[in-house]
A protein has these predicted regions:
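Surface-exposed, low-hydrophobicity beta-strand/loop segments enriched in small/polar/acidic residues
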Residues: 1-96
Length: 96
């Protein structure tokens, strides 16, 4: 195997996780309040046209785990855009 089978990235704010082609495998989002994030296939300036996945939590559903049955192929890069602020929690992006 030439590289890692998966990489993990943890944060709670907007971030460019990876530049260049990759595959999104999963997302975990947790917070004690309402929060949301979107994954975009870009390296900056996320827009509706390059959004590939959106994940949300609420005050009654504190954690969302999305493990994709088939990875989403990203060509430009993997950018996380936090929509509703993540107050006390965090997200974890799983990619390769």
């Amino acid at each position: 195997m030439s590289g890692p089978s998966a990489a993990y990235y943890n944060n709670n704010v907007d971030a460019l996780v990876h530049t260049g082609p990759c595959e999104l495998i999963g997302v975990v989002l947790t917070d004690a309040d309402a929060a949301s994030l979107a994954i975009h296939d870009c390296t900056s300036s996320p827009a509706a046209g390059n959004k590939v996945l959106e994940v949300q939590v609420t005050t009654t559903i504190l954690t969302q785990v999305v493990m994709l049955p088939t990875p989403i192929t990203l060509k430009a890069g993997l950018y996380v855009d936090v929509g509703t602020a993540i107050a006390g929690g965090s997200y974890c992006i799983i990619w390769r």
